[in-house]
Amino acid sequence: MAIKHFLQFKDFTREELEYVFERTSWIKNQFKSYQKYWPLSDRTLVMIFEKASTRTRLSFEAGMQQLGGSAIYLNTRDSQLGRGEPVEDAAQVISRMSDIVMIRTFEQEIIERFAANSRVPVINGLTNEYHPCQILADIYTYIEHRGCIQGKTVAWVGDANNMCNTWLQAAEVLDFKVHVSTPPAYEIQPELVGKINPARFKVFADPMDACRGADLVTTDVWTSMGFEAENEERIKAFADWCVDGDMMRVANPQAVFMHCLPAHRGEEVTAEVIDGPQSVVWDEAENRLHVQKALMEYLMLGRIQG
């Protein structure tokens, strides 16, 4: 099997994604039934962090251990990557001592260069541009709660960040629509818009209009990592883009609310919504664990028969 990476959502076909979702359900059921499943015994995951994280580290490290393998944590401050070693050189060495690599960093270019020089699969744990593992978990969570996402409408409210970018890619691959509402100056990046089928998304000035009839309403923090200096300015700019009960009430009555966490109640979402009956954020967070186990299994072992 040729080396397969997961650097952007569109790296996988619809068929591959459906397979990963199917495997996620099976693996999750094994976990919930306390059935040991160790297909990655004696395999090693190296996790490289330039951006700190709770959920990404925990889900990958625990997931690898639950599949029988081991995980090694590296951060750029304590490794040669933080001392100027070329990414290409690091990839050559690290990939000779591991079976799979997950990287959480700032620039997409870094992970692309690493993958180009790696002998093993590379997973994007998050970059400024994309967050494919999170959207994988989000879509799986929607399927668990409401069924197939094809033909549905996702409302994105807030910053057109890596999450928004990845939702747009996912809409292309899995055939659904995204309604996007952002404050002026925080819109979808022009270079990305040109790559997306215009039938897959629509931009709204008013977040209420974006949520109207939506099947899934989602948002993220107003100030992502690396943009802390803009925090006060962003709080003012995003004040009208807080997902509240009124927005959820104009959505489909069966709509669910998602947030990749951590959340700031009273900023991007009200407590009424995130702690309310339509919120599935805790299942969404847990599903990072299970969907990434299925992802790692597929990247290392290919399709499991039977």
Curated annotation (Swiss-Prot):
Domain of life: Bacteria
EC number: 2.1.3.3
Family matches, as Gene3D superfamilies: Aspartate/ornithine carbamoyltransferase
GO biological process, one term: L-arginine biosynthetic process
Keyword Secreted (UniProt): no
GO CC terms: cytoplasm
Metabolic or biological pathway, per its Swiss-Prot or TrEMBL entry: Amino-acid biosynthesis; L-arginine biosynthesis; L-arginine from L-ornithine and carbamoyl phosphate: step 1/3
Location of this chain's protein in the cell: Cytoplasm
Positions of L-ornithine binding: N162, D220, S224, M225
GO molecular function, a single term: amino acid binding
Keyword Transmembrane helix: no
Function per UniProt: Reversibly catalyzes the transfer of the carbamoyl group from carbamoyl phosphate (CP) to the N(epsilon) atom of ornithine (ORN) to produce L-citrulline.
Record protein name field: Ornithine carbamoyltransferase
Species: Dechloromonas aromatica (strain RCB)
